[in-house]
């Protein structure tokens, strides 16, 4: 299967547009390499940095070692943004991540943690037909509501659904 990659100059133009439109100086612009070879990824990254990208995100199977990430980091001159999956998650040390990355995200840790917890608790619930003795703890309703800011929803419900609109 062939992979369609956006032309580098079109990508650079989009980065320049994002830089120009940036209102918050703390907004970080991350550019993806989307390249088939390491050399192409480095060349694309250089162009993206010149266009104003703050971080480079190597979305490419051509990087298979820390040495390749080091070459990208050195070649483009800015820190990398890493999505820590697969070998990145398993093989890189914290020190290596800090060496090359300005931003590192573990995008599936939460999902996989919740999935395993659900699997364990639902298996026990199916077996025992009771929530007592579940292998993983559950949050209580009050803490859950507090965590998601449900009091704001309840205030809006009170205001609009019950007709308690503020006087103008």
Model-flagged regions — what are they?
Residues 1-82, 90-106, 112-113, 119, ...:
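Alpha/beta enzyme core
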Residues 85:
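Histidine-centered beta-alpha loop that forms part of the nucleotide-sugar donor binding/catalytic region
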Residues 111-114, 151:
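Substrate-binding cleft of secreted/luminal carbohydrate-active enzymes
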Residues 125-168:
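Flexible C-terminal active-site loop/helix
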